[in-house]
């Protein structure tokens, strides 16, 4: 996952 990836967004 790239930095800034939000699994909740």
Curated annotation (Swiss-Prot):
Sequence positions bearing 4-hydroxyproline: 3
The keyword DNA repair belongs to this UniProt entry's keyword annotation: no
GO biological process, one term: defense response
Gene Ontology CC: extracellular region
GO MF annotation, one: toxin activity
Keywords: Amphibian defense peptide, G-protein coupled receptor impairing toxin, Hydroxylation, Secreted, Toxin, Vasoactive, Vasodilator
Tissues and organs where the protein is expressed, per its UniProt entry: Expressed by the skin glands.
Compartment(s) where it occurs, according to its Swiss-Prot or TrEMBL record: Secreted
Secreted as UniProt keyword: yes
Family as reported in the entry's similarity comment: Belongs to the bradykinin-related peptide family.
UniProt function note: Produces in vitro relaxation of rat arterial smooth muscle and constriction of intestinal smooth muscle. May target bradykinin receptors (BDKRB).
Entry protein name: Bradykinin
Natural source organism: Pithecopus hypochondrialis (Orange-legged leaf frog)
Organism lineage string: Eukaryota, Metazoa, Chordata, Craniata, Vertebrata
